[in-house]
A protein has these predicted regions:
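N-terminal Rossmann/SDR dinucleotide-binding element
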Residues: 1-75, 195
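Active-site Tyr-X1-5-Lys
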Residues: 129, 145-182, 201-209
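Hydrophobic/aromatic anchor residues within beta-strands of the central parallel beta-sheet
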Residues: 53, 95, 118, 171-174
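NAD(P)H-binding glycine-rich loop region in Rossmannoid oxidoreductase-like domains
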Residues: 58-98
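Glycine-rich NAD(P)-binding loop of the Rossmann-fold in SDR/ketoreductase-type enzymes
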Residues: 35, 59, 75, 94-105, ...
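A conserved pocket-lining segment of Rossmann-fold NAD(P)-dependent short-chain dehydrogenase/reductase
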Residues: 88, 141, 177-232
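NAD(P)-cofactor binding segment of oxidoreductase domains
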Residues: 70, 90-119, 157
Length: 236
């Protein structure tokens, strides 16, 4: 069984659905701070399966220990955490407390229960701003002044240091950026706030004539001076 933290969020729910489609059993934990039980209902509707779910804050290590003890967890995919660069500048303590404390609590619970397989969803933002072609070997830009980026850098360092203590650890870190799209049944997708900040929800609102235009303030070295972005479909 695979435990998916943040499994009712946009990325986590699609991960859970893909795992079930490939015959894997999943257990979802989520504190519902940025998700809804409606997503759980949709997962069960699409898959036709019962999906075990436990509402907990994974910073609560004793409660997380009980989940590991109750279910036969063999691996963890960590998709929980705060993810807004802009918001983190306004709420730095919340971002450090959530993103750093979550990974520490999760690793403690895994260590205690003997689970040693982890996929951690990090961010391409750990590199900071760079004009170079990115690679896994590139060092982090620790001087970039943003709490979200720093919290992800800290989380990766904690994971690496923990992995060095036991050769049984099998860990992969995925540095994601600009995840978009939705499941083909059109009943599972991104939770969009009333005032979205991501460009795809904004573009869809403009296309649906719910707003007049999208304001692009940044200038770039492109033909029309606007920023070019690459996107990764959530099912990829």
């Amino acid at each position: 069984m695979i435990l998916v933290t943040g499994g009712l969020g946009f990325i986590g729910s699609h991960i859970a659905l893909s795992l079930m489609a490939h015959g894997q059993e999943v257990i979802i934990v989520d504190n519902l701070s940025n998700a809804s039980l409606q997503t759980l209902e949709r997962l069960e509707f699409i898959s036709g399966m019962y999906v075990p779910f436990v509402k907990i804050d994974i910073r609560n290590t004793p409660a997380l220990n009980k989940v590991f003890e109750q279910y036969s967890v063999e691996a963890v995919i960590h998709a929980a955490g705060f993810k807004s660069i802009e918001e983190s500048a306004l709420k730095p303590l919340e971002y450090y407390n959530d993103n750093v404390s979550c990974i520490m609590s999760l690793l403690r619970a895994m260590q205690r229960t003997g689970v040693r397989t982890l996929i951690h969803l990090s961010s391409l933002a750990v590199y900071g701003q760079s004009s170079s072609t990115l690679s896994e070997e590139m060092p982090f830009n620790y001087s970039y002044p943003n709490p979200y980026i720093k919290s992800q850098q800290m989380a990766e360092e904690i994971i690496r240091d923990t992995a060095l203590t036991d050769s049984e650890w099998k860990i992969a870190i995925l540095r994601l950026s600009n995840i978009a799209g939705a499941f083909e049944h059109a009943v599972l997708g991104e939770f969009v706030a009333p005032l979205p900040k991501n460009i795809i929800p904004l573009a869809l609102q403009a296309a649906a004539k719910q707003r007049d235009y999208i304001e692009l303030r940044q200038q770039a070295h492109t033909l029309d001076r606007t920023v070019e972005r690459s996107f990764l479909h959530v099912l990829d």
